[in-house]
Amino acid sequence: MLNEFRTFINRGNVLDLAVGVIIGAAFTAIINSLVNDIINPLLGLLVGGRTDMSNYFLPLAGQTATTLAEARAAGPVLAYGSFLNAVINFLLVAFVIFLIVRTANRFNPKPAEPPALPQPTPSERLLAEIRDLLAQR
């Protein structure tokens, strides 16, 4: 059983997946920092001076609150700033993954096309015709 597990782990796809998950987890921290520390302050500067986009919300029950946590404690809230952060994170991660995959595909050789089947010789065609005629009888 241990040998089977070792064989399973040593397959290329499993190792590639494990490396991808680990790198992806580490990369998420970089993207979160990029969004929270660089992009959000720039967007906040454009839309009203707030650098924390997660504090943009709309209380649905008419309550007033200064922070998202207070608004959530008071009732239902449409937290569109948090959603905007999540969308920006997703788009950046998806774009970077696209760039990585595109670059990796350039380095991976494309599999060779299988050679075309050889055309039958004239004698093989004649034998096939004879076979077909005999089959019709």
UniProtKB/Swiss-Prot annotation:
It is a multi-pass membrane protein. Gene3D superfamilies: Large-conductance mechanosensitive channel, MscL, domain 1. One of its GO terms (molecular function) is mechanosensitive monoatomic ion channel activity. The chain crosses the membrane at residues 14-34, 81-101. The keyword Secreted does not apply. Keywords: Cell membrane, Ion channel, Ion transport, Membrane, Transmembrane, Transmembrane helix, Transport. It is found in: Cell membrane. GO terms for cellular component: plasma membrane. The keyword Transmembrane helix applies. It comes from the Bacteria. InterPro entries: Mechanosensitive_channel_CS, MS_channel, MSC/AndL, MscL_channel. Pfam families: MscL. HAMAP family: MscL. Homopentamer. Belongs to the MscL family. Channel that opens in response to stretch forces in the membrane lipid bilayer. May participate in the regulation of osmotic pressure changes within the cell. This is Large-conductance mechanosensitive channel. It comes from Chloroflexus aggregans (strain MD-66 / DSM 9485). The lineage of its organism: Bacteria, Bacillati, Chloroflexota, Chloroflexia, Chloroflexales.
